[in-house]
A protein has these predicted regions:
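Short catalytic/ligand-binding loop motif for oxyanion handling, primarily in non-cytosolic enzymes
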Residues: 41-43, 148-153, 235-238
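Terminal, low-complexity interaction segments
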Residues: 34-38, 171-256
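N-terminal targeting leaders for non-cytosolic proteins
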Residues: 30-131, 135
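Short, threonine-centered small-residue motifs that mark membrane-proximal processing/anchoring sites
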Residues: 13-31, 250-268
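Extended extracellular/luminal ectodomain segments enriched in beta-structured repeat modules
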Residues: 135-142, 224
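Short coil-to-beta strand junction motifs in C2/discoidin
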Residues: 155-178
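Bacterial N-terminal signal peptides that target proteins for export
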Residues: 2-15
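C-terminal membrane-anchoring or membrane-association module
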Residues: 273-282
Length: 282
């Protein structure tokens, strides 16, 4: 009767071969923390990059961090000397307690997840939902999500464009929801909902607007090659959503999904090693 140690041997060999031959597969968990990005614009509250290359031209190429692609569209209007952007920006702004549109690049926690200096800001406007592309199939474990300072104070206090969540009585059943959709090619695999604010509780003391980094489990999305981020709110008007269409993101943890041929090769090698070892023992 083979011992437990004998049965574990092939698995050990598979992991060893994986580490040596295929370091980019599921052996490692890759993390995008935006620490490798270095092109910045200087804002009143700190450094950020929103697609502006500094040459008064439009740019829709997006940008990458740790090999992962982030959608971004920056438009510069030469006639009116005006610019606007949408998609993803990355930021080093540390101004989580300042409200208003001028502070659109700040995460409410003030720093990145775990106190890091860098994080990403998503703004869903002009060109639609923000998108992340991985270039190959991956399994995403989790993403850290929070509100931006701009959206947070808009919901908590209201402003000239948006209502105070809960209304004057505090009883309005408002919410601000982020839906994260996984795609494999053009096929949606699944979706995960995360509430950036939720005022639907019967007990108003349970109402909340997220102000800290929160880890969102995305394992249910399965094997994917892209993520789409959609925002919705109960505060809507003639021109769409009134709530500022922003959220902050950090620490994308994922692993590449091995190609079937690679898995078969590793399995055959492990089985061959184990059979040979058993034969020599006899």
């Amino acid at each position: 009767m083979p011992s437990a140690r004998d049965w574990c041997a092939p698995r050990t060999l598979v992991l060893s071969l994986c580490l040596v031959l295929f370091p980019g597969l599921l052996c490692y968990g890759d993390i995008v923390g935006f620490e490798d990005n270095s092109l910045y614009s200087q804002g009143s509250n700190g450094l950020y990059y929103n697609g502006d290359l500094g040459n008064n031209t439009s740019n829709s190429q997006g940008w990458k961090s740790n090999g992962v692609g982030f959608s971004n569209s920056y438009t510069f209007d030469n006639q009116y000397n005006y610019s606007y952007w949408s998609g993803f920006a990355y930021s080093r702004v540390n101004a989580g307690n300042d409200s208003g549109f001028q502070n659109q690049y700040a995460a409410k926690p003030g720093t990145g997840s775990g106190g890091s200096a860098h994080y990403a800001i998503a703004y869903n406007a002009f060109v639609g939902d923000s998108i992340i592309t991985f270039g190959a199939q991956v399994q995403v474990a989790s993403i850290d999500i929070s509100n931006t300072a701009y959206a947070y104070f808009s919901m908590k206090e209201g402003d000239q464009f948006s209502k105070k969540f809960g209304g004057a009585s505090g009883n309005d059943a408002d919410f601000f929801k982020l839906r994260i959709l996984g795609f494999r090619g053009a096929t949606e695999t699944a979706a995960v909902d995360f509430f950036l604010a939720d005022y639907r509780f019967e007990n108003n003391t349970q109402d909340y607007v997220v102000d800290q980094w929160t880890r969102v489990d995305l394992t249910s999305l399965g094997a994917i090659d892209s993520l789409k981020f959609a925002l919705s709110s109960t505060d809507n008007g003639q021109f769409g959503m009134n709530t500022p269409a922003y959220f902050a993101m950090d620490r994308i943890e994922f692993s590449a999904v091995p190609e079937p041929g690679s898995v078969a090769l590793l399995s055959m090698a492990a089985l061959g090693w184990w059979v040979r070892k058993r034969t020599l023992r006899r």
